[in-house]
Amino acid sequence: MGSRASTLLRDEELEEIKKETGFSHSQITRLYSRFTSLDKGENGTLSREDFQRIPELAINPLGDRIINAFFPEGEDQVNFRGFMRTLAHFRPIEDNEKSKDVNGPEPLNSRSNKLHFAFRLYDLDKDEKISRDELLQVLRMMVGVNISDEQLGSIADRTIQEADQDGDSAISFTEFVKVLEKVDVEQKMSIRFLH
């Protein structure tokens, strides 16, 4: 299986993905093997249904929101490069990356990009704000029926009240960042990928 994965991924493609995502050659090869095993249609792309077969996503209350993050607007398939680009947001920041070239593009796994990714999970209508209704939807996904609607409403109201600095009864990206400034987002939004 590993040899099949490496033969289908051209060296030049591997180098481009490595440069773009920061993953090592062996990580890319391993993830390519995983990608091809998920690709039930064997057409070089994954569908939402392919992702829903992943047990960790199937049981995650935000699984559908995470799956949607892999698909550009209006698309229903994702190729390997798009798959890797999204996974790169979850790659831990290595010590040697903290002093990267300031003129180069910001790494996909930077604090800022991780925060943008998390914000988009909440901003369901993509209007650059998290409304009370959007916050309620996400909270409902996370807690299910274990908490009453009244309690959830109270949590949403209190969250917005604490985060909302401009009085528009919503949370902007800037306000979202401010709320999370003391949270170790780099650690909490990281998945360990084997080398």
UniProtKB/Swiss-Prot annotation:
UniProt binding sites for Ca(2+) 2: D164, D166, D168, E175
UniProt membrane topology term: Lipid-anchor
Record-level GO cellular component terms: cytoplasm; endoplasmic reticulum; endoplasmic reticulum-Golgi intermediate compartment; extracellular exosome; focal adhesion; Golgi membrane; membrane raft; microtubule cytoskeleton
Keywords from the named record: Calcium, Cell membrane, Cytoplasm, Cytoskeleton, Disease variant, Endoplasmic reticulum, Lipoprotein, Membrane, Metal-binding, Myristate, Neurodegeneration, Nucleus, Phosphoprotein, Protein kinase inhibitor, Protein transport, Repeat, Transport
Residues covered by region (Necessary for nuclear export signal): 143-185
PTM characteristics: Phosphorylated; decreased phosphorylation is associated with an increase in SLC9A1/NHE1 Na(+)/H(+) exchange activity. Phosphorylation occurs in serum-dependent manner. The phosphorylation state may regulate the binding to SLC9A1/NHE1. Both N-myristoylation and calcium-mediated conformational changes are essential for its function in exocytic traffic. N-myristoylation is required for its association with microtubules and interaction with GAPDH, but not for the constitutive association to membranes.
Expression by tissue: Ubiquitously expressed. Has been found in fetal eye, lung, liver, muscle, heart, kidney, thymus and spleen.
Transmembrane regions listed in the UniProt entry: none
Effect of V183A: Inhibits translocation to the cytoplasm
GO molecular function, a single term: protein kinase inhibitor activity
Disulfide bonds: none
Residues given in the record as Ca(2+) 1 binding sites: D123, D125, D127, K129, E134
Record has Nucleus as a keyword: yes
Chain positions of motif Necessary for association with microtubule and interaction with GAPDH: 2-6
Motif Nuclear export signal 1, residue numbers: 138-147
Chain ranges for the short sequence motif Nuclear export signal 2 as given in the UniProt record: 176-185
InterPro entries xref list: Calcineurin_B_homologous (IPR051875), EF-hand-dom_pair (IPR011992), EF_hand_dom (IPR002048)
Main subcellular location: nucleus
Subcellular location: Nucleus; Cytoplasm; Cytoplasm, Cytoskeleton; Endomembrane system
Pfam families for the chain: EF-hand_7
Annotated ranges, domain EF-hand: 26-61, 66-101, 110-145, 151-186
Family: Belongs to the calcineurin regulatory subunit family. CHP subfamily.
Quaternary structure note: Monomer. Interacts with STK17B; the interaction occurs in a calcium-independent manner and induces the translocation of CHP1 from the Golgi to the nucleus. Interacts with GAPDH; the interaction is direct, occurs in a N-myristoylation-dependent manner and facilitates the ability of CHP1 to bind microtubules. Interacts with KIF1B (via the C-terminal end of the kinesin-motor domain); the interaction occurs in a calcium-dependent manner.
Related illness: Spastic ataxia 9, autosomal recessive: An autosomal recessive disorder characterized by onset of spastic ataxia in the first years of life. Clinical features include motor neuropathy, cerebellar atrophy, spastic paraparesis, intellectual disability, slow ocular saccades, axial hypotonia, distal muscle weakness and atrophy, and pyramidal symptoms, including hyperreflexia and extensor plantar responses.
Protein name: Calcineurin B homologous protein 1
Organism encoding this protein: Homo sapiens
Highest classification ranks of the organism: Eukaryota, Metazoa, Chordata, Craniata, Vertebrata
Gene name linked to the record: CHP1
